[in-house]
Regions:
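Conserved ABC ATPase signature
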Residues: 139-143, 147
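ABC ATPase NBD coupling module
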Residues: 69-85, 115-116
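Conserved catalytic motifs of ABC-family nucleotide-binding domains
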Residues: 160
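Short coil-to-helix segment of the ABC ATPase nucleotide-binding domain corresponding to the Q-loop/switch region
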Residues: 96-105
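Helix-to-loop junction immediately C-terminal to a conserved catalytic motif
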Residues: 52
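Catalytic Walker B motif of ABC-type/P-loop ATPase nucleotide-binding domains
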Residues: 164-167
Length: 171
């Protein structure tokens, strides 16, 4: 049997005494897709944030390729996060940055690439998602909500992550 790419076992999380996650058990194999559906406030976003180590689960186990990340040190969490691309429930674009910088923010921070290389990656990724190449010089407020969602998706895939997570992908 192969080790799951992602495995959550018995994951729990509470906020102010209210339990949001109660013993979540999920295993996702490589090349497999999983969709978690539930009512508003049931813990879908919290599960993803625990998986990324953005918030710490109260208990259970969270593994990526068999490596425990729950309780991992900052360096290990950062290395794990680099393997993921994610779109958040709310676009989370930087209003003060042009689209090309929004798309390549993580790439530039982690790989110290040139401005020209970053702009080209942004242009290629934006075009791949059906937006006009000239969009890269605009700012988020100049785009429709749907276009902003595509920019958030472009940012998630620009550095070709190993694992993609989408919070509210149908919105």
């Amino acid at each position: 049997m192969t080790t799951p790419k992602i495995q959550l076992a018995g994951v729990t999380k509470s906020f102010d005494g209210k339990q949001v996650l109660r013993g979540i058990d999920v295993a996702v194999e490589a090349q497999e897709s999983l969709c978690i559906i539930g009512t508003s406030g049931c813990g879908k976003s919290v599960s993803l944030k625990c998986l990324l180590g953005l918030i710490v689960a109260d208990g259970g186990s969270i593994k990526i390729d068999g490596q425990e990340i729950l309780g991992a040190n900052r360096k290990k969490l950062e290395a794990t996060r680099r393997r993921f691309g994610m779109t958040f429930q709310f676009g989370a674009l930087f209003d003060s940055l042009p689209i090309w910088q929004n798309v390549t923010f993580r790439l530039v921070q982690s790989q110290k690439m040139s401005r020209d290389d970053a702009r080209q990656i942004a242009r290629d990724t934006i075009t791949q998602l059906g937006l006009a190449p000239n969009v890269i010089d605009q700012y988020p407020a100049e785009l429709s909500g749907g276009m902003q969602k595509r920019v958030a998706l472009a940012r998630a895939i620009a550095d070709k992550p190993e694992i993609l997570l989408f919070d509210e992908p149908t919105s």
